[in-house]
């Protein structure tokens, strides 16, 4: 019989315990992102959002076309040529009724841009077409007014903002766009006049028959194969 003090199994137990603790500490350290890693992820999100903003031609309406170095990049209408005529007058000059919509300043300026809105509010605007100033800073889980944090009396973004198409973009893409607008742009103080459009344009003209549902109907529909 081996004396207790010389039993190799008794010596092995504390060694294994020490190794296990060290391994746990190393594992925990490996799973926690460092400040630099967190910053890198945020930078990649902003860069991805920039790519989407350029490729989706946001500057075509909000200023700067597809050139982030251009004067007036995303800071809103600066000339009547950037305005949009809505109604019969868009086809026949002078016809009535006639409304004018003006793309807003998308830079993070608190007074004249979107700086006062959170990234979640911007996401909700892109996903649901809701005006960010009247949108809660929470996740929305329904498209039915009054349910799932969806506003009871929703007010929608003015045309030609193509939110019925953008709403089908993945969450990570819409959040990346919000991140770029909030954290990737310099604030520009430029007040854009309010649009002279029909109130709640989308609320009065939007129908699932014309614009489909969110989420979109499952593939294939009657027009697909």
What feature does the model see in each segment?
Residues 39-40, 48, 52-54:
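N-terminal module-boundary/linker segments of secreted carbohydrate-active enzymes
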Residues 2-13:
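Bacterial N-terminal signal peptides that target proteins for export
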Residues 25-27:
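Bacterial signal peptide processing site
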Residues 32-37, 42-44, 63-101, 131-225:
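Flexible coil segments in periplasmic/lumen-exposed cytochrome c-class electron-transfer proteins
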Residues 102-105, 109-116, 130:
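Mid-length scaffold segments of soluble, non-membrane domains
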Residues 15-18:
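Hydrophobic helical h-region of N-terminal Sec-dependent signal peptides
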Residues 21-23:
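C-terminal motif of bacterial Sec signal peptides marking the signal peptidase cleavage site
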Residues 51-63, 104, 121-127, 175-179:
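C-type cytochrome heme c attachment motif
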